[in-house]
């Protein structure tokens, strides 16, 4: 009588092949998700810079510039008359706008806000940092890796 079924060797070969394919797939998927998060973060940075530059231009043409869906405070006074305290307040309003109105979360840890105060030196992974440490400019920085040197920074000058 002939037994039907697979031998132990055949089963072990199949399990080994599945294991190798799974290991390769996990590495490839990990690289794919890292690249997608990095690209999303860089895109968020570029969009926020374009948004701020266009809003700052409104001030130059006599229009009003509001943040946080609030029509109560025109930010143009902070843009057109920069100083250390006004730039600092503008920075805080920008951070609040991106976190609350846009609902930004940290791409690598969605329990954290997506935007915070900081510069290229102290911008942590996954954040779009806004710095207003110099009275005539806003600095937007994004850090897309654990390595501190992997960041993109853009300076937006005030007082158009």
Where are the predicted features?
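N-terminal single-pass transmembrane signal-anchor helix
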Residues: 2-33
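Generic N-terminal initiation segments characterized by hydrophobic and/or small/turn-forming residues
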Residues: 5-9, 18, 48, 87, ...
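Intrinsically disordered, low-complexity segments enriched in polar/charged small residues
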Residues: 9, 43, 49-50, 81-83
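Functionally constrained cores in energy, signaling, and assembly domains
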Residues: 14-16, 24-25, 45-50, 54-57, ...
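Membrane-proximal N-terminal amphipathic helix
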Residues: 34-64
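Periplasmic/extracellular, small/polar-rich flexible segments of pilin-like filament-forming proteins
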Residues: 57-160
């Amino acid at each position: 009588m002939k037994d039907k079924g697979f031998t132990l060797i055949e089963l072990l070969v199949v399990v080994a092949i599945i294991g190798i394919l799974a290991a390769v797939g996990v590495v490839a998927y990990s690289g794919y998700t890292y690249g997608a998060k990095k690209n999303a973060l860089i895109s968020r940075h570029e969009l926020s810079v374009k948004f701020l530059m266009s809003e700052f231009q409104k001030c130059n043409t006599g229009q009003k510039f509001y943040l946080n869906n609030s029509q109560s405070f025109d930010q143009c006074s902070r843009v057109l008359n920069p100083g250390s305290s006004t730039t600092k307040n503008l920075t805080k309003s920008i951070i609040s706008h991106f976190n609350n109105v846009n609902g930004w979360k940290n791409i690598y840890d969605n329990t954290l806000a997506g935007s915070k105060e900081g510069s290229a030196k102290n911008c942590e992974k996954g954040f779009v940092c806004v710095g207003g440490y110099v009275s005539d400019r806003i600095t937007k920085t994004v850090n897309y890796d654990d390595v501190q040197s992997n960041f993109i920074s853009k300076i937006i000058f005030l007082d158009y």
